[in-house]
Each structure stands twice: as C-alpha cells, then as structure tokens.
Amino acid sequence: MSEALKSLPVYVVDDDESIRDSLSFLLEEHGFNVTTYEDGPSFLNTADIKVAGCVVLDSRMPLMRGQQVHEYLIAEHSSLAVIYLTGHGDVPMAVEALQSGAVNFFQKPVKGNELAEAILVGLNASQSKAEKSLHEEAYRSLTQREKEILCLIIEGKRNQRIADELCIAVRTVEVHRASLQKKFSAKTVAELAYVYGLLN
C-alpha cells in the first residue's frame, strides 16, 4: 500500500533553495515523487491541487506565508494534505496549523523518518478525501430517479421488486443500476453500498 501512496505527488514549498534541495533528496531516498517550489504562488499556479497528494510548506515565506497557501487550498476544496515546516515555530502557530487541518507541524531541522511517516499519513488521508470528493460529485450528478433506485439497491432489493415499487420496467431499473455502477466505479452492490456509506 505504501508503494502506491508513494507514487502520489509530494510538493515541497520553501524559499530556501538549500532546504528544498535537501528535502527533495531526502524524500526521494524514501521513494516519494517530489516536486519543489520556491514560493506559494508558483506552487498554486503550477500544481494540480485537486488531486491526492501532500504539500510540505514552509510557514514563513515571502509573497505568501504557508498559512495563506493553506487557506487557499481549503477555500478551493483541495484534497492535498498539508505539513508545515518552520525555522521559528511556536506553540500557538502549531496549534493553529493543526486546527486548520494540517497533518503535522515540524520545526527545522526535521528528522527524515518522522517527515516520511507524516507524509505517508497525509497521502493516505488525502487519497481518501479525493475519493470521497469524486463520489460526492458523482452523487450530485444523479437524477432523482437514480437516487431513489440507489436507496432501494442499498436496502437489498432486487430489480423486480424495485420495478414494482416504482412502477417502472425491470429493464429501466437495470439501465439505472448500470449507470449508478459506472458513475461510482462500483462493480458490485457491496461496492455501491460502501460508497453510499462514505457519503452518509
């Protein structure tokens, strides 16, 4: 599982080139797919913030502080996990970062193994969040009839019973069921039930 997670993007955003280079080297040694940026705007203008991944942010940078980058990610409903690094950390700053949803907060210099573990935790959470976002988007795209049929499928009712309850043809139920499975990338009723459970 960690190998699949490690293929997800990890972004390092720090204005200090030597720190970017050392973190990039360190994280690549741990098998991560790393891209570095020297400031918040270049990261936000280039990286795909809608996909699963993790961003390691310096809290104090020119142009945009790490907290401002994080606020932007939250406002844009990004799935990226956030880890803060700081050279001048204090307890209130760490508490604020964690309350805003950051995975962790480290003071420089950071131990490689600790950062790698935090990134794996972040990537796992980010992947779950990205999947949930996709499912929520799929749910919003459902017609009212598809929502009714989905609820009845989740209740364990068969096609004929659903058709009888909704006064529609069995073939119509089959078409809607196929559409639901396609929209949620679910091959079985169990997978549909799992997705439905995530949404509720």
Each model region followed by its residue ranges:
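C-terminal output helix
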Residues: 90-92, 110-119, 165
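Acidic catalytic/metal-coordinating carboxylates
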Residues: 38-39, 64-69
